[in-house]
Amino acid sequence: MNTILPADPARDEVLAGRPTLWVNPSYRKRAIDTSDLPVSRDDVQIARLNWQRLAPLLAECFPELKDSDGEIRSELVELKELREALGYRTREFGNVFIKADSHLPVAGSIKARGGVYEVFLFAENLARQNGLLGDGEDIRKLAAEEARSFFSGYTVAVGSTGNLGLSVGIAARALGFKATVHMSSDAKAWKVERLRRLGVEVIQHEADYTSAVENARDIADADPTIYFVDDEQSRHLFLGYSAAASELAAQLDERGITIDEENPLFLYLPCGIGGAPGGVAFGAKAIFGDNVHAFFVEPVQSPCTLVHMMSGSQELVSVYDVGLTNKTEADGMAVARMSAFVAKVMREMLAGVYTAADDDLFKLLRMAWITQRQKLEPSAAAALLGPHFLVHHGEGRRFQAEQGIEEKMSRATHILWTTGGSFVPEEQFQNFLRQAEAVG
């Protein structure tokens, strides 16, 4: 179908495939307490408790988690040289940090928070249902040969452009499950190869991400031994991501940074289908309430959240519906249609969306590496632009005025959530750097 987007200050730039900032007109205070949402504050707390219960098993399965007692967590990195390079040195930019999920253990991306959580939760539930784990028994039993042998009769499947597939595949194989990852035509060869080395079956589809997910779902529906991790509809994925907000809150507290009405918090979250950024944003709203403002970032040709939310439609709108191509080097964000689940949750909770051009992503990737040795994928580098749009763009200044925060910006804290990069092979990363040099 063809969709005509309503009048909006960002519309023409969006349709022309140029970088811009869209401010969500439906954004409102206390939206998290809306009664008809499919998730609640209580669900975020339950997810935190689930992570704690699973931690001993995670430490047993992944040696890199021994020192953290099974916690999957990333550093909060203060911008120093990179802050100068990005032009964020003046007072109006307040505090600026990278939340380095690009260097998360186990899977090397933010998807470790969702994919690992859902697979390990499925394993626990399956074991309890089949008498392999009783009440009060040590969850580390699930890493033993008896459980692994049982799990080998089941397959965990997922549709992915790359990083979720890595996360789910790594988690499933660690427990003894078979694993199948349906990948779109946008998937990078190194991610396909890494999965196959782990013994994961990779099925590549000629079509885009949405089609890969639909194919994976159809196959799983026909086989009771296949568990499908549904990136479009999964509450488990969403809530796995949401627990990251409590980790961030603790890190800010350790640094003596207060978040309240006078000291706002801004999150800049790269977005594909929306589960990871939506989950993190929801978790942050559960903790910080109206004092946190979450912005998604999407490629100029794949702004699926932006076009759907700008349209105001109850039916999901695709980037193809407005004449965009869904072609981008940021493979983790090459998604034509956002999750309906995330759209419902974030409709009134998302502050806005900004877009980035591929050439700029490569420049930012190189800048992050040269200045602070932050190894990022192009999609992760998109987070670095957030404060620029909020402070310098006309719509960003209008947002500040509407929220009554212009005078508070020097006391604000900006979190640039870098979502992946540490697992990129050195040869591929050098190619990224060469591409950055080529575009100037």
UniProtKB/Swiss-Prot annotation:
Pfam families: PALP. The keyword Lyase applies. Its EC number is 4.3.1.18. GO terms for biological process: D-serine catabolic process; isoleucine biosynthetic process. It catalyses: D-serine = pyruvate + NH4(+). The modification N6-(pyridoxal phosphate)lysine is found at K111. Keywords: Lyase, Pyridoxal phosphate. GO terms for molecular function: D-serine ammonia-lyase activity; hydro-lyase activity; pyridoxal phosphate binding. The keyword Methyltransferase does not apply. Its cofactor is pyridoxal 5'-phosphate. Belongs to the serine/threonine dehydratase family. DsdA subfamily. This is Probable D-serine dehydratase. It comes from Rhizobium leguminosarum bv. trifolii (strain WSM2304).
